[in-house]
Amino acid sequence: MDFGALPPEINSGRMYCGPGSGPMLAAAAAWDGVAVELGLAATGYASVIAELTGAPWVGAASLSMVAAATPYVAWLSQAAARAEQAGMQAAAAAAAYEAAFVMTVPPPVITANRVLVMTLIATNFFGQNSAAIAVAEAQYAEMWAQDAVAMYGYAAASASASRLIPFAAPPKTTNSAGVVAQVAAVAAMPGLLQRLSSAASVSWSNPNDWWLVRLLGSITPTERTTIVRLLGQSYFATGMAQFFASIAQQLTFGPGGTTAGSGGAWYPTPQFAGLGASRAVSVSLARANKIGALSVPPSWVKTTALTESPVAHAVSANPTVGSSHGPHGLLRGLPLGSRITRRSGAFAHRYGFRHSVVARPPSAG
C-alpha cells in the first residue's frame, strides 16, 4: 500500500481507530505460554524415558519405545523453540506499532489545521491572510509526510515481525505394520474361534483320539521293541554293572589265587565272614578300651600280656612261615568283632609295642 498517497487524516485515523498493541501483546504472552508448556512436555518425556530405560525396563520393547519416542521429544523441543520465537516476534510487532503510533500525527491536530486553513481562506477578503494560509498548508504537508513515514516504517517492521517459521508436523511414532497385523488378527479371529469350538466338541474319552496311541498303532511290534530297547539299554546296562560290582565287592578269590574254592564256590571276604555269628551288642558309658589316646569299642582289641623274650631267644628264634593261602577280599577295613574273637589266639595286636629293628648281639650282655 502506498501510504504517501493517502492524506494524514486517513493514516492517522487508521492508527488511532484500531485496537492498538493490546492484541499483539496478548499474542506474545500466549506464545510464551505455549513455549513453556512444550518445553515442560519435552523435559518430562525425556525424564520418563531415561528413568524407564535406566534400570527397570530393558530389552527389545524398551529399545522400540525409545526409538519411537526420541523423535517426538526432539519435535517437542523444536516446537517449544519455535513458539518462543513467535512470542518474541509478536512482541516486536507490538513495539513497532507503538513506535508508529508515537510518530503518527494525532487526528485532532490535523482537524485543527484544516479548520484554521478554512477560516483563513474565508476571511481573506483583501489577501491579508495569505501568509497565514501558506504556513498552515506547510504544516499540513509536514503532517502528511510524517504520517507516511510512520506508516512505511510500521509496515516494514510489522512485516518482518510477522514472518514466522512454519512449525513442522509431529513425527509418526506408530508402526504401520502393526496396524496391518492387528487388522489381519481381527479378521482371523472368527475362524480361530470356530476351530476352537469344533475342537472342544471332540470326545477325548476314546483312546484312539490320543496321538501317542495312534503313533504306536502305526508301527509294527518289532519296531516298538527296537524303540524300547534303544531307549532303555543305557539305563539297563548301568544298573547291571552296578549290581555285579556290588557282588564282586563282597567276594574274594579262592586259595592259591584261583578264582574259585575247592567246591567251585567263591569265598566271602573276611570282613563279612562273621556276620550273624557275633555276640549280642552291649552298651556302657565311659568304659571304652584305649589304643593310645584313642577310644575304641571293646570288641576291637583284647589286650594280651606281652613279655620280652631273652636275647638268646631273639637270636635263635626260628622264623615262622605264614599261611600260604589267605583271603584276598575286595573290601578293606577294620575287622569285625566275631573275627577277632575267633582269631585272637593266632596273633597278638602290637598297638603301642616298641619294635626292635636290629637284634641285640650276645656280646652286649
From Swiss-Prot:
It comes from the Bacteria. Pfam families: PPE, PPE-SVP. GO terms for biological process: response to host immune response. SUPFAM superfamilies: PE/PPE dimer-like (SSF140459). Gene3D superfamilies: PPE superfamily (1.20.1260.20). Belongs to the mycobacterial PPE family. PANTHER family: GLUTAMINE-RICH PROTEIN 2. This is Uncharacterized PPE family protein PPE25. The lineage of its organism: Bacteria, Bacillati, Actinomycetota, Actinomycetes, Mycobacteriales.
